[in-house]
Amino acid sequence: MEQGDTLFVYADMLTYSDSTQLAVLYADPGKTVRLINRDVTLTTDIFNYDLGIDLGFYEVGGVLTDKENRLDSRYGEYSPSTKDALFRTDVHLKSLSNNDTLDIYTEEMLYNTLTHIAILDTTSTIIASDGTIYTTQGVYNTETSQADLYHRSLVVASNGNTLTGDTLYYDKNTGFGEAFGNIELTDTTNKVILLGNYGYYFEMADSAMVTGRALAKEYSSGTDTLYLHADTIRTYLTIKPAEALNDSVSIPADTTHLMIAAPHVRFYRTDLQGLCDSMSVVQSDSLLYMHYHPVVWNENKQIFGNVIQVHLNDSTADWARLPDFGFMAEWIDEEFYNQMAGKEMYATFENGGIRHLDVSGNVQVIMLPMENDSTYNKIANVESSFLSADFKDQKIERLKMWPESPGTMTPLYLAKKNIYFLPQFRWFEPLKPISPEDVFNISREMLELMQEPPFNSRKSSR
């Protein structure tokens, strides 16, 4: 059967109804009916062709091939005039390109042999060499390897990272994925989940960004999860410039992973809470840097300064350094606080609590020593150049200051309130995140704190 000079159908037997304009073509056993339309070939055992609407279809299984793909299905339709095809039941699209590996499995697909675009509207799986896509509705261009995906589709990269959202755009060639609405990006290597209202992932650079109620959930400890919020959260690899010149795609082995969050950073974990305006985490050094009025809480202790550096061991802090002014306050009872301040502060941690503290430069201390009956009845004010303190069960076990300098010890019943606090004392408890959800609470007081000038080791900030 021929139609024009571009459509040919080969069969062993044909029946035709003039009233319905339907031709039915059959093949002998061991053979197939073949439709050829330029670079499109369709094969099946029984082929139906409606000349009235220029539409052919099969119901007993068939195969359609063009220059890009092969499509198998139980039921199929093909229109030579529009080049549109419809496939249903056990649909399998396989790329014929030697440079590509692509398989699409679904129960229904619309496909155009000119554009090589597949439209999916039911549960579908798209498998490529560098990842897998799970979707219930989407458009996939098999020629450009670009996809628009809807209804919370899921992209799983070859390294195990995943990206999902209400709407996704994904480019397989570049490894770039963009998500809109309730997005979730999982970094399985670094055990971090990023959530937000908008975000993207770039596989080649192993980089990602989320914004719009952005949240990072870090679960590497296996026992407790860190919840971190900022306006924008970014993760990426750094590459040494000299090594990146030869090949901008390959990633040298000594790269390091970074996470940067800013502004309005707040985080919560059951044993540690904090805030600042900018935070970065350097994976290779296991270092966390907090800038612009950072404050950290651990139980009834509060530490603040201009910069806080925290060293992480398996996501647990083992030491912290405040190189440009540090202040630690420990709430005792009612309006009483143990306080230590200095130009530089270094603390070590053990079992989730502070174990040792060193303070140097302009050291100032206010202490309320506990009596044998567990009461407090006097307050000590001391200044020196250096301080060293050991802690046990979250309480000061030993304290040493040098060189020795005179201090004052005042009974509480004689003490005036102006000696209760060091000049730089501030208690930021109202700003402390108290739950995972509370990290989103950016209060006016926190915004005002971020606008203040840096702390001074001698000047009052009360």
Each predicted region: which residue ranges?
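Structural signature for solvent-exposed beta-strand/loop edge elements and short helix-capping sites
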Residues: M1-R462
